[in-house]
Amino acid sequence: MGRLFGTDGARGVANTELTCETAMSIGRAAAMVLIEVEHRRPRVLIGKDTRVSSDMLEAALVAGLCSVGADVQLLGVVPTPAVAYLVGKYQADAGIMISASHNPCEYNGIKIFNGEGYKLSDNLEEEIEAIVLDGAQTPPTPTGGDIGRVSRCDHAVDDYVRHLLDVTDVDLRGMRLAVDCANGSASATARRLFSALGADCVFLNDQPDGVNINENCGSTHIEQLADFVKKLKYYGGVAFDGDADRCLAVDEQGNLIDGDKIIAALAMDMKEKGELDGNAAVVTVMSNLGFFRFCEQNGITPVSTKVGDRYVLEEMVNSGYAIGGEQS
């Protein structure tokens, strides 16, 4: 873990720990590193969740990026995976997500993706840290037309939902489902997605007001969803976290279906369809013994990594595995 970036970006209480000055410095440093790597004027996408501080930090990041000569395209409120996907689709050089995931609204964070939609390597993060914290390089100060430009993308959500539908082979017609959006990024996408899949859904906590993100709702407070599903006899329910990069589920009795169970079920389905590349499923050391026993009993190789989705993805990419995830 670095001095500024943890396993999931830079995080802290917005405006005291993660200040506008820090965000602007990260923007400047990121643009400097991108120019050094790409040898051209870079274009950076920025997405955000629904926290009241996200607009403030977005403005600071934009100022930092543009002041060094990077162009910025604003995606608005989107899930974190949307930024990772759209970087490639829009052929941008990097993407930044402003979010603190499952944390309360007081917190916020900055997560950077490279041009392939993967989190930055440790080396590039350390280079950014050295510029921000140690003043390792002096930022350039372009003028006139060399200053970065800002544009807004009005179709980011549509493009992301269309992508999800293209890669999802499932028919939810006739299923009564409850979906908890955590008053976060899923509020912008879940209704369109589940409706297009044919599900008969009720959407909970999909009215964000800037401060109610993750407030007694979402994947870290799944009791509300469990009670709702059980009492109203729904088929099941899905709960997202604030930036919609994780979800948990409940069955018709309100029983928790955690990440281990979701990964096990998906891996088994893929194995039966002949789609489980490497015949393995990647998880972290936090996965429970039941997951490993299930895999062994069903001829699936469980592969463990350090905690953090970046390490799961690295293992999947490096070894050619088709599925991976975290217990949480």
Predicted regions located by residue number:
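Gly/Ser/Thr-enriched, mixed-charge loops and adjacent short helices
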Residues: 13, 108-230
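N-terminal small/polar loop signature for handling phosphorylated ligands or for N-terminal nucleophile
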Residues: 32, 40-107, 192-250
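Short beta-strand-to-turn element immediately C-terminal to the catalytic PLP-Schiff-base lysine
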Residues: 112-115, 248-252, 296
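Short acidic/histidine-rich active-site segments
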Residues: 238-241, 322-328
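Proline/glycine-rich low-complexity loops and linkers
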Residues: 82, 126-161, 166, 253-325
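Conserved PLP-anchoring active-site segment centered on the Schiff-base-forming lysine
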Residues: 44-46, 179, 277-282
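An N-terminal, well-structured beta->alpha segment
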Residues: 1-63, 67-68, 150-176
